[in-house]
Amino acid sequence: MTVTATPRPTGHPGYSQTLPREPESAATARRLVRTAMAAWGLEQDMIEPGTLIISELVSNAVVHSRLASIRVMVSQPTPSLVRLGVVDRSKVLPMLRTDSDGDQIHGRGLVLVDGFSHRWGTDLYRWGKQVWAELEVTS
């Protein structure tokens, strides 16, 4: 698998990788997040929430996407933010579930994303979407 880096206005590269739409891709996505954050010299305490967030975003894409692959993206759009995103070919919007059905084992990942990120959202495209979350850079 190939990791690509693109220049960003902050001087930091962005990292992205196309992965198979399967649960095992979450491990590769976590490694990509760790690699990017280490390359940017970010604090160790950002890695755990970043890897948790990307795992949840990948899991959602695995369940809800239509095609055989997804794209994971990690960038630092400003010196104070890291953006983690997963692009898929589904136009179904993610929903933050706040119900407390104790028997429900799926559907609470976005609650974790919401709790650990500075903010999160969805960018819609003609052919699909990107679900992203941002972490504030700690000094």
Question: Where do the PLM segments sit?
Answer:
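Heptad-repeat coiled-coil signal-transmission/dimerization helices
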Residues: 26-33, 110
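STAS-typified acidic loop motif
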Residues: 16-28
